[in-house]
């Protein structure tokens, strides 16, 4: 079984030293969902929400969040991201929004947390913008879809998940 990398021999939390690692292209994709009533989703899709373009605001919030992950999650490294993409999809059949984020860099550590943070904050932004019309929206699940690059190798969620 793998060891927890952020715990030292004394059981204390610490930031991993990546100075000896090789720089490689690293990429991660994550997704999040926001479930809501059909009329709330319709308001977002039609652009009739009184606060403005919900998807555009959530996209920008997700991008900003990815760039600031190191300030939010204590043991994350500050990273020079080369790409952050946040896409939002209205799933009217299931009355939800699906958010997919992609983060990429050439560096010594992965971007999984940045991708997860981007998707999560985009979902939180949708909630914030729509809570005046619906307070019982549900956020989740949030998960890593794929990662590539680095010593630990590639990961991808099974297609049937």
From Swiss-Prot:
Q: What does this protein do?
A: Catalyzes the conversion of (8S)-3',8-cyclo-7,8-dihydroguanosine 5'-triphosphate to cyclic pyranopterin monophosphate (cPMP).
Q: Write down the PANTHER family for this protein, in alphabetical order.
A: MOLYBDOPTERIN COFACTOR SYNTHESIS PROTEIN A (PTHR22960)
MF term (GO), any? cyclic pyranopterin monophosphate synthase activity
Q: Which gene encodes it?
A: moaC
Lyase in keyword set: yes
What does the record note on quaternary structure?
Homohexamer; trimer of dimers.
Query: What EC class is this?
Result: lyase
UniProt binding sites for substrate:
75-77, 113-114
Q: Which SUPFAM superfamilies does the entry mention? A: Molybdenum cofactor biosynthesis protein C, MoaC
Q: Which reaction does it catalyse?
A: (8S)-3',8-cyclo-7,8-dihydroguanosine 5'-triphosphate = cyclic pyranopterin phosphate + diphosphate
> Do you know which Pfam families this protein is assigned to?
MoaC
Record's protein name = Cyclic pyranopterin monophosphate synthase
Q: What is the superkingdom listed in this entry's lineage? A: Bacteria
| Organism lineage string | Bacteria, Pseudomonadati, Pseudomonadota, Gammaproteobacteria, Enterobacterales
Task: Give the E.C. number(s).
Answer: 4.6.1.17
Q: Name one GO biological process term.
A: Mo-molybdopterin cofactor biosynthetic process
The record, for CDD domains, names:
MoaC_PE
